[in-house]
């Protein structure tokens, strides 16, 4: 008797065949370019955002960010490859979801996790077996394991077996015409080896270079280190100037 394919193998097959439906939560300067890369790779993409103004613009074929021409959005919408929505239930149609919501600083200079928590709760309400969820928002080490994983497990899902959770930091440099979403290396750290495998396959479908790391905490720290390195160097050059 032949064993039925696991949730992991089934999702990997759908990613390979481009039959997986991809969700992107947060359609700003990170999420929209990522959504368009998935479209260009041959996927159907559902973009979710809480701003009805953004939804209306995108569905009218108009881009609201510098790095994505309106023509690109118009072609994706016309072809039926991309839809933007503020209807939470449509998250449940997705096989894999990238979360690219803001993490601004609060008045006390602490990270404001409200957008991440809202996205995590929305996903948990719509989650189903076989779903992959990847957090991209810049945040502190431990966020994926402490905030995202428990919400999915509270819905009866087992991370690493029937749902796959990872962190892959957004590294977009808005306005940079040389390094954009597709050719900027993508770091991926998952809760389990199966999570890393699925999330890496997801991004490898549309990103030139994918770099798996040992854990979501390692991937979360990569972004903080990169931001710190950049800030220190900018400050140093400004002082010398």
Question: Language-model segments: which ranges?
Answer:
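Structural/interface elements that position substrates and couple domains in central-metabolism enzymes
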Residues: 2-241
């Amino acid at each position: 008797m032949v064993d039925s394919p696991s949730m992991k193998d089934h999702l990997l097959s759908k990613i390979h065949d481009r039959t997986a439906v991809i969700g992107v939560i947060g359609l700003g300067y990170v999420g929209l370019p990522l959504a368009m890369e998935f479209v260009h790779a041959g996927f159907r993409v559902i973009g979710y955002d809480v701003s009805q103004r953004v939804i209306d613009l995108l569905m009218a074929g108009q881009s609201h960010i510098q790095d994505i021409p309106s023509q690109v959005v118009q072609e994706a919408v016309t072809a039926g490859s991309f839809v933007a929505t503020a209807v939470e239930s449509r998250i449940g149609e997705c096989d894999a979801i990238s979360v690219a919501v803001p993490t601004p600083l609060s008045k006390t200079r602490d990270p404001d996790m409200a957008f991440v928590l809202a996205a995590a709760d929305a996903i948990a309400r719509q989650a189903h077996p076989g779903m992959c969820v990847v957090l991209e928002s810049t945040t502190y080490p431990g966020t994926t394991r402490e905030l995202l994983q428990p919400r999915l497990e509270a819905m009866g899902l087992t991370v690493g077996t029937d749902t796959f959770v990872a962190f892959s930091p957004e590294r977009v440099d808005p306005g940079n015409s040389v390094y954009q979403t597709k050719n900027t290396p993508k770091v991926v750290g998952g809760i389990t080896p199966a999570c890393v495998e699925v999330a890496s396959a997801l991004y490898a479908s549309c990103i030139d270079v994918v770099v798996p790391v040992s854990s979501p905490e390692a991937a979360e720290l990569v972004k903080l280190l990169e931001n710190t390195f950049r800030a220190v160097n900018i400050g140093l050059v400004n002082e010398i100037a």
